[in-house]
Amino acid sequence: MAGKTLYDKLWEAHEVKRRDDGSSLIYIDRHIIHEVTSPQAFEGLRLANRKPWRIDTNIATPDHNVPTTPERKGGIEAIVDQVSRLQVQTLDENCDEYGIVEFKMNDERQGIVHVISPEQGATLPGMTVVCGDSHTSTHGAFGALAHGIGTSEVEHVLATQCLVAKKMKNMLVRVEGQLPAGVTAKDIVLAVIGKIGTAGGNGHAMEFAGSAIRELSMEGRMTICNMSIEAGARVGLVATDATTVAYVEGRPYAPKGEQWKQAVESWKDLVSDEDAVFDTVVELDASQIKPQVSWGTSPEMVLAVDQRVPDPAAEADLVKRGSIERALKYMGLTANQAITDIKLDRVFIGSCTNSRIEDLRAAAEIAKGRKVAASVKQAIVVPGSGLVKAQAEREGLDKIFLEAGFEWREPGCSMCLAMNPDRLESGEHCASTSNRNFEGRQGAGGRTHLVSPAMAAAAAVAGHFIDVRELIQGSAA
């Protein structure tokens, strides 16, 4: 009998009932709530005269709509947009009514849902974790079965603590070797997406393994699992190991005392068996990965920084040729244009992909002693949570950014998506550490280029894309 994958083990441990149609009822351990996808769910509970089944499994915070500028200290009334203000206010009211723990807008523990849950220890190995946000896959970095859900499913979880789901196939992404200096977890996952495409992981739970993955910090692993959704997979996973345990230990929601010892012992099995069989296997050599930059309107439209934008005339597939032509037109680029010739109007360092302390340190290392180029209209750094912000300030990172000409903001989703005041104007190019570069994602007509924090900082000081390895080598010389 073949061994089991990590996904198999997590699924079986939470399968309440298998149904005749092939679907299963899955128990949910942790439910994370934000202001955008929860109002209708709570209203559904009221209309059905129900209450949350297990209040203690829920944790909430506003993130999508909150302003990241100082005026937010004025409270909810400082949110200018009426819809945004109403959503944040409604979350507060719903959590207060049902006794759900919420880190409100000006609580130091507030931040992006996928940052605050891990840093609180609310995301633990072996859990099932859901949230009304597609990037819930982030939490798979802990060896947890985590994925996004829709608003109706948010209501189902609140009411029953279960979801109906169908088991997915297993995909293994093995990344072996040592990453070159200046190449990060963000570059790994962009390279994976560039290799398999945004549909490559469709219908799969995607486990990341190999020596390069094992060497990553938890922040790096979260970055990779965060963007498994952009690779087509609903679920991203990394096996639990000593790095995972060290990160979780001592956090507020983590087990304590004897329960901690028991938990750590049980987590040892949160790995795929050596003889486990995967439906699909993808392999990458970490030593060959270079800093990545997306050039088009899909995350799969990504290249190494030393490459050139594709020429649609060289593409034989008419559908692909049309996609390239449309992307070039929207992005305002020309065929065969060098990535390093793309000039930037704005730079955004933040989002649930890259706003943790390790990300800010990497960007600050590049920004230190340098200045944002005069041609760059705005460069902002948005910590993923109040706790990340406080840690960065203790380390003096805020001063490095401010002296270089970056804006230092309050935590929130910010410029990742055009649901708050931080957004692009039409035609502007932005080097962004976020996860999506669709048309209009950062604002109507905005042009998004996905990069790592170090690459974003390098672009800010150069005014155009530059190979960050040149700056690192220059600093070492």
Curated annotation (Swiss-Prot):
Species for this entry? Pseudomonas putida (strain GB-1)
Alphabetized, the UniProt keywords read: 4Fe-4S, Amino-acid biosynthesis, Branched-chain amino acid biosynthesis, Iron, Iron-sulfur, Leucine biosynthesis, Lyase, Metal-binding
One family name in Pfam for this protein: Aconitase
Tell me the PROSITE patterns matching this sequence: ACONITASE_1, ACONITASE_2
Q: Which gene encodes it?
A: leuC
Q: Which family does the record assign?
A: Belongs to the aconitase/IPM isomerase family. LeuC type 1 subfamily.
Record protein name field: 3-isopropylmalate dehydratase large subunit
Pathway annotation from the record: Amino-acid biosynthesis; L-leucine biosynthesis; L-leucine from 3-methyl-2-oxobutanoate: step 2/4
This entry's comment on the bound cofactor is: Binds 1 [4Fe-4S] cluster per subunit.
